[in-house]
């Protein structure tokens, strides 16, 4: 499945609420005799779009908001093209779908290249103001330490994405071997041993536990993350935990050593192979699809399983709940900690009329209808109003029925929508508002993911986690990036070596911890603490989504 297709599928599975949104302010085009304002806009279109100039939503935006768009396109390597444009001084009035880290926002904001948006948001974009109040982490990624807002993010409120480090188990195997769903590390070990020693009838060359490598193309298929969380919090990315408001590096703590000891035990008992730490998605998914795997790591089982296909056992794959640790508590890695950057920015090349027109478009996009039209084009093409009685992901009356399966099928091309370009708002209302396919039906994998997440993962994250967006000062970016890369690379290398036994946890642990410290861990933590501001509060992420 293509990346964009998965992003829509994961957040949407098509979307409840109301098309305009009860609290939203619809932007309506006022009759105007003035000449359209011409705006240079940078964007990075997907390969599915035929032509941005003739695209239906381009024409709709131009007519509705009285503007002519001159596109600067970067379909390949947009980050490099954006940097070159900014360095040359010949940059556009608007970056519609660019990419600015907080440090870049500060850098170009302090240089006067990016225009503070505060007053324009208040004047022209009340829907965006409302979204900032209701979307966790949105204000944090938008508001720089100097109080200015230099950009706007994309919002993708994907419930099951927030707990993507999942383990999936074939419950048909459990039933055949008269086993219960494991709830602790010891119980999981016993289940895997049973799969190995007493494979179900007809299964040859069984693989009790499988996973994918970090650069293999699978989605959150890391073997260690789910397991490690039974011993210490592991967020899979920067390895930070928050203790009493302080940033702590998990991989040097005793809990990390205990987790590695357990994972090494699984390895030495032949419950997974070293390939599970490195293999690509083709190898990994192939093994699952051959029916040889009992448990596997993946954010969404639908990537590894031919969902709805006869003989694939798709209906038997269920999530293993987060394992309870020695304290009897369970926790899961959390990825809903806000957006890490912004995509939309206005530069000092923009005139007041250009700013007004483009901010009115942003305001429209920050509605359920606006985001749906931006993504898929006009009503009646790829989406229609839901019928009475059709339900959304959370079981309430749906509003929109989106044919995302056709829109994203194979190498299909279209010229109707912009397909997730720019500061769209795939909000909770948008996600919940689409007609849900029953979880046990072919094509119902998104509903299944929602249900599995609500049942087993939602609410099992720590109250406070490290935010996705942190404000590193421009003068410290290079140093911070070097520390982060060197430390995390070192940790990942030693973690794999501890797991397979080329490093010994008893004799080499102290050398490992010293190695991390020697790479500048203390300074890295100080910079992270300062840039964090305050931890991300996850308390709103619970319940039905």
Residue map of PLM features:
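Short beta-strand and adjacent tight-turn residues that come in two discontinuous sequence segments
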Residues: 96-97, 297-300
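Conserved small-residue motifs centered on glycine
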Residues: 44, 368-493
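Extended amphipathic alpha-helical segments with heptad-repeat/coiled-coil character used for oligomerization
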Residues: 313-335, 390-410
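Positively charged n-region of N-terminal signal peptides that target proteins for export
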Residues: 1-7
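Conserved N-terminal structural module of periplasmic/extracytoplasmic solute-binding proteins
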Residues: 7, 18-190, 234-240, 247-251, ...
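General small-molecule cofactor/ligand-binding pocket signal
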Residues: 68-74, 275, 318-320
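Ligand-binding "clamshell"
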Residues: 104-119, 306-332
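Helix-loop-helix "hinge/cap" segment bordering the ligand-binding cleft or interdomain interface
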Residues: 118, 145-221, 241-287, 292, ...
């Amino acid at each position: 499945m293509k990346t964009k297709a998965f992003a829509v599928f994961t957040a949407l599975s098509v979307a409840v609420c109301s098309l305009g949104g009860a609290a939203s302010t619809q932007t309506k085009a006022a009759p105007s005799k003035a000449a359209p304002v011409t705006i240079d806009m940078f964007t990075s279109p997907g390969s599915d779009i035929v032509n941005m100039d003739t695209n239906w939503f381009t024409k709709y935006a131009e007519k509705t908001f009285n503007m002519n768009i001159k596109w600067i396109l970067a379909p390949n390597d947009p980050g490099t093209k954006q940097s070159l444009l900014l360095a040359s001084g010949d940059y556009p009035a608007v970056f519609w779908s660019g990419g600015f880290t907080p440090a870049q926002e500060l850098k170009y904001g302090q240089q006067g290249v990016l225009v503070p948006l505060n007053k324009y948001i208040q004047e022209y974009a009340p829907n965006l103001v409302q979204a900032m109040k209701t979307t966790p982490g949105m204000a944090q990624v938008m508001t720089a330490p100097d109080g200015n807002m230099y950009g706007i993010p994309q919002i993708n409120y994907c419930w099951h994405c927030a707990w993507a480090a999942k383990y999936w188990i074939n419950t048909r195997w459990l039933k055949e071997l008269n086993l219960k769903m494991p709830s602790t590390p010891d119980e999981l070990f016993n289940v895997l041993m049973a799969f190995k020693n007493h494979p179900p009838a007809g299964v040859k060359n069984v693989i009790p536990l499988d996973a994918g490598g970090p650069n293999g193309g699978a989605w959150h298929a890391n073997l260690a993350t789910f397991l490690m969380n039974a011993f210490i919090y592991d967020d899979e990315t920067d390895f930070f935990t928050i203790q009493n408001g302080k940033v702590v590096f998990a991989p040097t703590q005793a809990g990390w050593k205990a987790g590695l000891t357990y994972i090494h035990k699984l390895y030495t008992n032949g419950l997974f192979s070293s390939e599970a730490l490195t293999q690509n998605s083709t190898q990994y998914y192939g093994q699952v699809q051959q029916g040889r795997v009992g448990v596997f790591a993946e954010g969404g089982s639908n990537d590894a399983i031919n969902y709805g296909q006869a003989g694939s056992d798709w209906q038997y794959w269920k999530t293993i709940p987060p394992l309870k640790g020695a304290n009897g508590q369970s926790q899961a890695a959390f990825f809903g900690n806000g957006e890490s950057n912004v995509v939309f920015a206005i530069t000092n090349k923009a005139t007041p009329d250009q700013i007004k027109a483009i901010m009115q478009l942003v305001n429209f996009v920050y509605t359920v209808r606006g985001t749906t039209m931006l993504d898929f084009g006009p009503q009646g093409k790829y989406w229609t109003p839901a019928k009475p009685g059709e339900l959304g992901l959370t079981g309430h009356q749906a509003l929109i029925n989106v044919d995302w399966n056709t829109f994203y099928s194979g190498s299909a091309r279209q010229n109707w929508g912009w397909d997730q370009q720019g500061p769209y708002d795939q909000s909770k209302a948008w996600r919940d508002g689409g007609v849900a396919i029953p979880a046990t039906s072919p094509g119902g994998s998104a509903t299944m993911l929602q249900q599995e997440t609500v049942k087993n993962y939602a609410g099992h994250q720590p109250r406070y986690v490290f935010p996705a967006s942190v404000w590193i000062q421009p003068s410290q970016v290079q140093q911070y990036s070097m520390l982060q890369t060197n430390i995390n690379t070192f940790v990942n290398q030693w973690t794999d070596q501890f797991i397979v036994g080329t490093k010994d946890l008893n004799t080499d642990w102290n050398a490992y911890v010293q190695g991390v410290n020697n790479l500048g861990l203390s300074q890295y933590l100080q910079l992270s603490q300062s840039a964090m501001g305050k931890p991300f509060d996850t308390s709103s992420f619970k319940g039905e989504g």
